[in-house]
Amino acid sequence: MIKRKHLGLKTASLAVVAFLHIPILIVFLYAFTTESSSFQFPPPSLTTHWFSVAWNNPDVRSALSLSMRVAFTATAIALILGTLAAAAVWRTRFFGKSAVSFVIILPIALPGIITGIALRSAITLGHVPFSFWTIVISHGTFAVAIAYNNVIARMRRTSGSLLEASMDLGANGWQTFRHVLLPQIRPAMIAGGMLAFAMSFDEIIVTTFTAGNQQTLPIWIFSSLVRPRQRPVTNVVALFVVALTFIPIVLATKLTRNTEGT
């Protein structure tokens, strides 16, 4: 009976994995097809021609550059603000601390379309022109929450006696932070930064409301779906996006596991 249960769980797990990843594998497969507009299964033959076409496409390179700059900038801002907010919530006592923590994390739970509409309304009411910074600010709403969530979780597992011992030995606040607290939270900061970068790089819903006429890589992919002869190139770009976001997520997961074990 127990063996049957285990077999059923394994079968269900494999079915879920297949349901989630087979569509991605199909996209990867058709990035190498020799066909330019239609899809046959299996592909008549395989080629890497579309990779050079994608790389030489000025729109793709422009969108990639914008996505990279936005992701790096949003991640840097998120790490600074998220870490400072986590330190303030962790070390100080004030009325409404739980409410502040909830408000910081809230953007993760909100649907992207709600955040996008709210930000677009604020931008329009403020007569702010759409620019690189409107995208960065919109991505920062959830990137800060990701960084904060990782850092505050690690801080709560850090013994306050370490900081007290450092201060008793004559270290000032900066020395205590640099030599005692920072080594403790560094893995969480790196993991939070990687997750924030991955989320920012492939974000499309919020970006659609705050980018104006600018095209990030996910927006370029979405707009290219209506062009049949762009499909192999679109698949190549999608493959690149998946690879670029998959690596930071895997590394962040490993860092988080290592941190939990210490």
Predicted regions, residues:
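N-terminal, non-cleaved signal-anchor transmembrane helix
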Residues: 1-58, 62-65, 69, 256-262
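Transmembrane alpha-helices
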Residues: 11-12, 17-24, 106, 140-141, ...
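Interhelical loop and adjacent transmembrane-helix boundary motif
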Residues: 2-5, 38, 48-60, 207-256
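Non-cytoplasmic
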Residues: 30-38, 147, 189-222
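Membrane-interfacial helix termini and adjacent extracytoplasmic/periplasmic loops
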Residues: 39-42, 48, 97, 113-143, ...
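Transmembrane-helix boundary motif in ABC transporter permease subunits
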Residues: 1-6, 72-104, 117, 121, ...
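Membrane-embedded alpha-helices of multi-pass transport/permease systems
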Residues: 22-25, 29, 80-84, 117, ...
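C-terminal transmembrane helix and the adjacent membrane-cytosol boundary/short C-terminal tail
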Residues: 2-11, 152-163, 167, 173-180, ...
